[in-house]
Amino acid sequence: MTAIAPVITIDGPSGAGKGTLCKAMAEALQWHLLDSGAIYRVLALAALHHHVDVASEDALVPLASHLDVRFVSTNGNLEVILEGEDVSGEIRTQEVANAASQVAAFPRVREALLRRQRAFRELPGLIADGRDMGTVVFPDAPVKIFLDASSEERAHRRMLQLQEKGFSVNFERLLAEIKERDDRDRNRAVAPLVPASDALVLDSTTLSIEQVIEKALQYARQKLALA
């Protein structure tokens, strides 16, 4: 009988620290990593590379079904590998973002990408970063964590990130955008942003990233009986 690879799902709102936590856990456990938030951008970029019409659901479905993508975390840096090429920077362009919002609107594309995401489940295990990993994509995952933080703290973190890149930021506007996105994500009809009933809700508002990583790893190892 083939062993089923364990999955640790990390869900939560934007700015809670999911990406940093997932990279740290994947490196600590030497497990595979899935950044579900990047999947639609990767598909959009693949479509642009292969001259596939991003407005054609029929053309996109086979591309989504066989998307050749890997996520590799090295020293805290995430590399997105599409067809053997590092596209970490390329998927962040506005052209790709616009195309990603188009491809994400197609139900059959979303279904194909759901199956593709589940295919990341390989031994020794998978860390899945997203918003509906524990509720929709891997409902049977043995370890589910919902990482949260206050909207004010998430806005503050985002402001610091943008300021470090040289951008001028209005905190109140940033906070309003985050609250609006939270409201939209939590109240949408399909896969709303809610903790799975069996998830550990971890509030990172007053914790350092090191404390968050320590708590999450301790919980995961306890649930999985890992040394």
Swiss-Prot record:
Disulfide bonds: none annotated. Pfam families: Cytidylate_kin. It is an enzyme of class 2 (transferase). The keyword Cytoplasm applies. It catalyses: CMP + ATP = CDP + ADP; dCMP + ATP = dCDP + ADP. ATP binds at residues 12-20. Coiled coil: none annotated. GO terms for biological process: nucleobase-containing small molecule interconversion; pyrimidine nucleotide metabolic process. Its main location: cytoplasm. One of its GO terms (cellular component) is cytosol. Keywords: ATP-binding, Cytoplasm, Kinase, Nucleotide-binding, Transferase. It is found in: Cytoplasm. The keyword ATP-binding applies. GO terms for molecular function: ATP binding; CMP kinase activity; dCMP kinase activity. NCBIfam families: cmk. PANTHER family: CYTIDYLATE KINASE, CYTIDYLATE KINASE/PANTOATE-BETA-ALANINE LIGASE. Belongs to the cytidylate kinase family. Type 1 subfamily. HAMAP family: Cytidyl_kinase_type1. This is Cytidylate kinase. The lineage of its organism: Bacteria, Pseudomonadati, Pseudomonadota, Gammaproteobacteria, Enterobacterales.
